[in-house]
Amino acid sequence: NSAIITHAGMSTNSSYKVDTIPPTEEGAGITGAVGAQNNFLNAGDTVDVSVTFSEVVLDTSSGSLTLKIAVGSDNETATINSGSTTDNLTFRYTIQAGDNDTNGISIDANDISGGTITDLAGNIASDVTLEAVTDNSSYKVDTAAPSVDNFTMSDTALKIGDNATVTFVFSEQICPETDSCAVEFTNSDITAPNGSLSTLATSDNTTWTGTFVPTDDVQLDDSNVLTLGTSYTDLAGNTGPTEQTANYEVDTREPTVSSIAITAQSGISSYNFLNPGDNVSFTVTFSEQVVVDNSSGLSLTILMGSDNRSAQYTSGSGNAQQVFGYTIDDLLTSGENDSDGLSTGSNPIVLPGGSTIKDLAGNSAIITHAGMST
């Protein structure tokens, strides 16, 4: 008898799929990084390159697949990191010391090498040549430490009322005080003896300025230097070097009168009397060396009995001791007589307009004094 061959048919059996088409590479790109800040990668950071295929693929190389990426002028090797059994293979490269790329990592046209890529059916991907990918500015590379090209003060001899502009010029941008940097550059990175430094300002993160204000009441000190520490970085996180300014001088203490005394006389008798024509010298000692401008006639008021007389300035500029001289006049013509002895009242130094007494830094002297007793 003839067979009846009609049948409802066999349903799909997923255990017996058929695929004779090899997988193809459809595109590549830089897709991520670990450790980057401000679009910069540093030594030890990693960057990932993903290659997309037309279907799910297998890495049969046991992890030896590689591709080349361009870091600056050098081609570096990225190694397979993940993606087998997906349609996207990810390759990873760890940034090395000495790598630099100011434009961003790119991918030159090159082949994936180091092993075989197949689809799940075993078809070998025969065309694994990547098309070139241009510089990606989100993945620039900087492993070089910044340098300090200039670190100066506008004034290195500071007196009362002075301040100085402090200027830093770096070889590249330095991390500002924002949330985008792990370490930020602030005025706390600078040690400033005998003074303080204001908040630093910049318009380009390369040139920074601040204002140094000296501390009040500092006796002359010329051993100071501003010191930049190493707690700052460039945008990539590279630590900068320490640096110092030239020495600067701070003197914010006014010279004061320490004493007034008679230090010389001529013609005095054995009984301690001065006669007409005799000369007497008064020495005013200051707390430090002072420079005297006597252009308007500096004088010292002395008491002759109950009368005031003026001893004229004679010498001492550049020293701590300033000398005033007076010549005794004839009693008959001037009535000069003092049986108790010469003295001065309080604040005896007369400083007319145009005359000055200043220390070597230029601070005006405080000339108040209790005076010299008889």
How would you describe each model-predicted region?
Residues 1-374:
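Non-catalytic beta-sheet/beta-sandwich ligand-binding modules that flank or precede catalytic cores
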